[in-house]
Structures are given as C-alpha cells and as structure tokens.
Amino acid sequence: MSKASSFVREYKLVMVGGGGVGKSALTIQFIQSHFVDEYDPTIEDSYRKQCVIDSETALLDVLDTAGQEEYSAMREQYMRNGEGFLLVYSITSRLSFEEITTFYQQICRVKDRDYFPMVLVGNKCDLEGDRQVSSQEGRDLAKNFGCQFIETSAKQRINVDEAFFEVVRDIRRYNKEQETRGHDQFGIQDAPDVASDKCCILM
C-alpha cells in the first residue's frame, strides 16, 4: 500500500455550547450509535472515530467540552487546538441559543480571526412541542456567523452524522482556500471569501 493511500487525515473537532444542550448526547450517538438519556455534566471527554466523508477517509478526534462558565479558561485551551467547531444549542432553550454568540466571540478571540470552520447546530428537534427557538432564527444566526446551520436530534439520530461531516467539509474548504491565498503571491486575485458561499442546511 502506498503512503498516499495509507495516510488518514486527522481532524480535531470541538463541541461548544451551554450546559444541557446535548453536546455529549450528540457525540456519543455519533461515535457509539447510542443515546445517553441522563444528564451528567461534562468536564472534558475525547472521542475518536474513523469514517469516510465524500470518498475520503478521515479520523475525527472529537472533544466534548464543559458548557459551564467556571470552565471557560479550560475551554479556551481546547479552542486553540481545535480545527473545527460544532456550536450547539437546544431548540427548547432560548437561553442556550443566546449563549451561542458568546461562545462564538470567545473562539474568535482565541483564534484571533473572524472566521473558522464551524456549523451551528440546533439540537433536540424531536421536541417540537417545546420549541423556543425557530428554525429561521437559527438560519439567521448562522448567516450572521457565515456558517452552515442544521437541526439535529441525538435521541432519534436525525442529522447527527451530517452535522459532524459538515464541519469536516468546512475544514477542507477552509484549508484549500488558505492554500489558494498562499499561492497568490502577487495579489492579483484573492481567494473567495470563506463566508460568502455558505448555505444553510436544514432537515
């Protein structure tokens, strides 16, 4: 087997969002195909999974972080190392939706740039009767961030794989555009704006 065919690219993904929004449930459903019903606040858990995304094998290193404010400093360290982010809120909690902007701004500050590969995730879409955040609000916020939007249900495994796959696709797009910028030595033609060609996806 050649080196090219045996090489598997690793992607460092970070789950970010308030407490109780289902970050751990999404991660465990993706990694283990199992729904965790009880809520046990996470400090830090790391998971790895190899999968094929768009005909290319990828090793996903997923870091599930604490949503509580007291772990903010620890979370910043994870943000520095992360390549792509899932910004998760619960559609049944307006507070968790409003907190997302704070998490987004924290990543921007830590990364020292306005854009990074990410997907905005509205979780618990199976609880439609308890919805406090409309799908349109999610789409609008994602448009403001310049990222994709998807609604998921860890319990019913709706769009779970797609949420993680979209972050990997975004990392690939971002890296390719960075390479294009690097090769554009004379500044004659800029690489396309990362945020300009994003579209929102919804189940």
UniProtKB/Swiss-Prot annotation:
SUPFAM superfamilies: P-loop containing nucleoside triphosphate hydrolases. It comes from Mucor circinelloides f. lusitanicus (Mucor racemosus var. lusitanicus). A lipid is attached at residue 200 (S-farnesyl cysteine). GO terms for molecular function: G protein activity; GTP binding. It catalyses: GTP + H2O = GDP + phosphate + H(+). CDD domains: H_N_K_Ras_like. The modification Cysteine methyl ester is found at residue 200. Its EC number is 3.6.5.2. GO terms for cellular component: plasma membrane. Pfam families: Ras. Belongs to the small GTPase superfamily. Ras family. GO terms for biological process: signal transduction. Residues 201-203 form a propeptide. Its main location: membrane. GTP binds at residues 17-24, 64-68, 123-126. Gene3D superfamilies: P-loop containing nucleotide triphosphate hydrolases. Alternates between an inactive form bound to GDP and an active form bound to GTP. Activated by a guanine nucleotide-exchange factor (GEF) and inactivated by a GTPase-activating protein (GAP). Keywords: Cell membrane, GTP-binding, Hydrolase, Lipoprotein, Membrane, Methylation, Nucleotide-binding, Prenylation. It is found in: Cell membrane. This is Ras-like protein 1.
